[in-house]
């Protein structure tokens, strides 16, 4: 059922992962106080305790608000100390990395995707789709929180493959 408190939470998680490119630890420790939806951004504390601001799209915002209003209110009642953590498990605690992995695999399987799907694939898709859409590599580096641009350049190989395919398909002497 797509309307259970867990299904709504899980959809919100999947939307946030794809919309923002967060690392799994950043996602599981995301705080409500760091959601700045009036400006379409979220504040992230990333690796090395570095802060960054990441834009977040309306679809993800809608699902997060739905989760907060329809699901989280029940989960937070069981919380002992995590009242600011956004995504909670059935005990009211922050989700574990493993729980997010299992949830990702579950929905991939339900969607008929049998290849190896894991949370980082959403971060990879986020970066790849931005670059394929023409985003500046430096801007993508900032959004991902990479200290070194060479780490971000890993995502450009897909873009190169795409460019080769376009060239092969459309250039008369390819």
Language-model-detected regions and their locations in the chain:
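Conserved catalytic core of the tyrosine transesterase superfamily
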Residues: 1-174
């Amino acid at each position: 059922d797509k309307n259970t408190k867990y299904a709504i939470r899980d959809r919100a998680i999947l939307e946030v992962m794809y919309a923002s490119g967060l690392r799994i630890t950043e996602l599981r420790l995301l705080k409500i106080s760091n959601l700045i939806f009036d400006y379409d951004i979220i504040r992230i504390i990333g690796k090395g305790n570095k802060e960054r601001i990441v834009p977040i799209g309306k679809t993800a915002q809608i699902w997060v608000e739905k989760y907060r209003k329809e699901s989280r209110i029940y989960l937070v009642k069981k919380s002992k100390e995590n009242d600011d953590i956004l995504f909670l498990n059935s005990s009211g605690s922050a989700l574990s990395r493993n729980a997010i992995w299992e949830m990702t695999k579950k929905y991939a399987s339900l969607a008929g995707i049998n290849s190896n799907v894991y949370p980082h694939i959403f971060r990879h898709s986020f970066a790849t789709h931005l670059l394929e859409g023409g985003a500046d590599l430096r801007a993508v580096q900032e959004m991902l929180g990479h200290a070194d641009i060479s780490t971000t350049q890993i995502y450009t190989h897909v873009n190169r493959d795409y460019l080769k395919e376009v060239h092969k398909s459309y250039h008369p002497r390819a």
